[in-house]
Structure formats: structure tokens, C-alpha cells
């Protein structure tokens, strides 16, 4: 389902824990990390699609989260031709997204990367809200920066370090906790994690990597 400009409606999810750390998922059998996201099906509202994707990709139910905010307008990114099926080139341009900021009110053990038979992630990690975006596939980095920046104003204020994250000040120990979005580096060989991250991969099962109708060849959702 494309709009008249060739963009497919989509939702993205920035999921916080109680420390205002953000969920990152490692795209299955790849070296890239990303936030949960997925297409809006015909007849769905963006919020309905968000809750469906939340369960399909990370196993959470509506009762496990609190909706904090969403972006006001669609945020768009174009997909390079090499990631688009040949029969879709010329009329498919990319994705337009509504981004949601959610806070987990459940527990880490509620997360389940195998909630469906076609998992999107094989590892996950909580990380600081502002981290370099070099672990994100290149053509999504600008929309991630826009979404994080717009939603940052709604971060719950009970976490003491939020004021440093929003203002770009330094913490008492001298650690810079401000906007790192401009520090986007070239990917290095091997698995790249967000700074300070570690992961415990799920052993591969040989499952096919379904795209659920997306006109891509090898692109993360």
C-alpha cells in the first residue's frame, strides 16, 4: 500500500525502560541494530499497527507499555534502488513513518523475540537515549535523528540525568551526555553494538527472512 508519492505507511517504536534507556534490536542474521518498526496494513490506524508490531517483534502487549508521545507528522526516508525489487523500481520510493515513544511498565522478562515464527531480531540491548547511529543502516540514520530529537522533549522527567541529555551539558564526572547524533561513523567489520552493549544471540534456526509484502530484496524493515 503506497501513497501517491511512492511511500509506504509505517510505524517506528522508541521503547524506554524505567531508566529512560532505549531498546535496540539486532536485525536477525545481520550486523545492524535498529528500533522496532513495520508497515501499516490496510484498514489499520497507526496506533493499531504500532501495538501489532510491538507484539510481533518484541513480544509485548498493550498492558506492558505506556504510550508517552508520538511524532506530529510523517517522517520519510528513501530506499536506495539496490534494496528495491526491480519490478517496484520507479514507483516505490521508501517509507513514511509515525514514531511512538513508549515506556515499559512491565518487566524485561516480558520481552520475547520469538513471539512469531518469523522473528525480526536475534538479540536486544538497553542503551542510553543518545548514542551514535553508526550501527543503523545508512539510509535510516537521518529519520532516526529526527524522531529521537522530536520525542526527546517528552522523556519522563523522573530520571535525574535527563536534563543533561536534553541540554547537552556534562555530568559531574565530565562525561558528555548530550546530542551525539552528528558522530556517525563508518561501519567496522563484524558485529557492531551500540556503545557499551553486549548481546546473547539466539542460535540460528534456518527460518526464512519474511518481508511480508514489502518491495525489498535485502533491506531491514
From Swiss-Prot:
Protein family according to the UniProt entry: Belongs to the Nudix hydrolase family. RppH subfamily.
GO molecular function, one term: pyrophosphatase activity
Task performed by this protein: Accelerates the degradation of transcripts by removing pyrophosphate from the 5'-end of triphosphorylated RNA, leading to a more labile monophosphorylated state that can stimulate subsequent ribonuclease cleavage.
Domain Nudix hydrolase per the UniProt entry, residue ranges: 6-149
Residue interval(s) of motif Nudix box: 38-59
Organism, scientific name: Verminephrobacter eiseniae (strain EF01-2)
Highest rank taxon of the organism: Bacteria
Primary enzyme class: hydrolase
Gene3D superfamilies: Nucleoside Triphosphate Pyrophosphohydrolase
Keyword Hydrolase attributed: yes
Protein name in UniProt: RNA pyrophosphohydrolase
Pfam families named in the record: NUDIX
Entry keyword annotation includes ATP-binding: no
Keywords: Hydrolase
Enzyme Commission code: 3.6.1.-
Cofactor: a divalent metal cation
